[in-house]
């Protein structure tokens, strides 16, 4: 999608790309290696793209949600392609989806480069990772 729209934005000299990553794109979580790798790739790609196009009038915002109370796990697919149909306790206890949407809209309207979305431990992990990556590693490693 970015490949399709970016040339038009560059031609106009303005635009705003918003993409969703995850707290897992900044903090590795045990038993979610593939997901974390994919979300780290999203962060890296759009950080680099931002550096390339910001002086051309293109804004790039990366939305970094933690747990948000949605049915995303229930509606996801299992490895065999069947409906997973099971709630995820972390998501169920997460930020209200309307509140999350308000945080995202506010961040986008203010042109924020990164928009953290969530409450509690995942937001604490983002903050702590900047101060003590080793501490966050030990915390996530020991989380069951």
Residue ranges of model-derived segments:
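Active-site helix of classical SDR
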Residues: 2, 38
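A short helix-coil junction within the Rossmann-fold of NAD(P)-dependent oxidoreductases
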Residues: 4-13
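Alpha-helical segment proximal to the catalytic Tyr-Lys
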Residues: 7, 51-55
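Residue(s) in the substrate-gating loop at a strand-loop-helix junction
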Residues: 22
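Active-site loop immediately N-terminal to the catalytic Tyr-X3-Lys motif
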Residues: 27-33
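Conserved active-site helix of classical SDR/Rossmann-fold NAD(P)-dependent CH-OH oxidoreductases
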Residues: 40-47, 51, 102
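SDR active-site lid
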Residues: 55-120
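A transmembrane-helix-recognition feature enriched in membrane-embedded lipid enzymes
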Residues: 111-143
């Amino acid at each position: 999608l970015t490949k399709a729209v970016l040339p038009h934005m560059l031609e106009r000299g303005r635009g705003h790309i918003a993409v969703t990553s995850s707290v897992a794109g900044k903090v590795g979580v045990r038993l979610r290696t593939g997901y974390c790798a994919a979300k780290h790739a999203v962060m890296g790609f759009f950080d680099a793209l931002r550096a390339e196009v910001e002086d051309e009038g293109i804004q790039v915002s990366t939305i970094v949600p933690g747990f948000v109370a949605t049915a995303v796990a229930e509606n996801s697919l299992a490895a065999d392609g069947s409906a997973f149909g099971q709630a995820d306790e972390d998501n169920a206890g997460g930020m209200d989806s309307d509140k999350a949407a308000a945080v995202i809209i506010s961040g986008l309207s203010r042109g924020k480069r990164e928009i953290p979305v969530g409450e509690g431990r995942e937001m604490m992990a983002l903050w702590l990772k900047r101060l003590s990556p080793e501490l966050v590693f030990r915390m996530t490693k020991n989380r069951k």
